[in-house]
């Protein structure tokens, strides 16, 4: 049995968010194919993920039984490390991802939990895991330099040791005359195919 962490990083409501329309469909199809797996939903806005404070940095520098017990945000790092698969639903906002997703990655990028330092430099501890990033974009931003959200997600996951990473992107949703319904439907179809093999 695998544990799937479904990370939702969008303040828009269910049914309104085009990203969530596709990511929720992905999860539905995944559950059909993998009924024995556990899916844990983590809505970053409902969790009130915040920016790191000075005391958080101090706790990161000295992780022991006391800091594990008294440092609330560390639970997210342990939760992330314990998952086998990650579904990250985050739209493109202003060429990147919502700031709350970056804040979340700051919570979970913890020495000794998700990566560590070796004589050769940092090494990710999250080996043999896989991820899919589902993103809706207003225009066509699939390539650099304007696209910085998906590239960041892939880079930070790679830093943590996750090497099997896919992207499901729904683009050109805000272009004048775009058939948004058809594009979302196309995104759902792609999501369904990826979910079967995920």
Swiss-Prot record:
The keyword Transit peptide does not apply. One of its GO terms (molecular function) is electron transfer activity. It catalyses: 2 a quinone + NADH + H(+) = 2 a 1,4-benzosemiquinone + NAD(+); N,N-dimethyl-1,4-phenylenediamine + anthranilate + 2 NAD(+) = 2-(4-dimethylaminophenyl)diazenylbenzoate + 2 NADH + 2 H(+). FMN binds at residues 92-95. The keyword Flavoprotein applies. Coiled coil: none annotated. Keywords: Flavoprotein, FMN, NAD, Oxidoreductase. Its cofactor is FMN. Its EC number is 1.6.5.-, 1.7.1.17. SUPFAM superfamilies: Flavoproteins. Binds 1 FMN per subunit. Quinone reductase that provides resistance to thiol-specific stress caused by electrophilic quinones. Belongs to the azoreductase type 1 family. Homodimer. HAMAP family: Azoreductase_type1. This is FMN-dependent NADH:quinone oxidoreductase. It comes from Lachnoclostridium phytofermentans (strain ATCC 700394 / DSM 18823 / ISDg).
């Amino acid at each position: 049995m695998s544990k799937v962490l479904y990370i939702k990083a969008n303040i828009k409501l269910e049914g309104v968010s085009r990203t969530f329309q596709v990511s929720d469909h992905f999860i539905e199809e995944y559950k059909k194919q993998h009924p024995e797996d556990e899916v844990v939903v983590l809505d970053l806005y409902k969790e009130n993920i915040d920016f790191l404070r000075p005391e958080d940095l101090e706790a990161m520098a000295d992780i022991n039984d006391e800091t594990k017990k008294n440092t609330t945000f560390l639970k997210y790092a342990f939760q992330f490390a314990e998952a086998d698969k990650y579904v990250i639903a985050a739209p493109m906002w202003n060429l990147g991802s919502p700031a709350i997703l970056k804040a979340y990655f700051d919570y979970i990028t913890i020495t000794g939990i998700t990566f560590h330092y070796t004589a050769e430099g940092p090494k990710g501890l999250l080996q043999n895991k896989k991820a899919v990033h589902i993103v809706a974009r207003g225009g066509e931003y699939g390539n650099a330099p304007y696209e910085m959200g998906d590239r960041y997600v892939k880079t930070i996951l790679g830093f943590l040791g996750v090497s099997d990473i896919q992207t499901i992107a729904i683009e050109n949703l805000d272009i004048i005359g775009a058939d948004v319904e058809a594009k979302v439907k196309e995104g759902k179809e792609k999501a369904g195919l990826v979910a079967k093999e995920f």
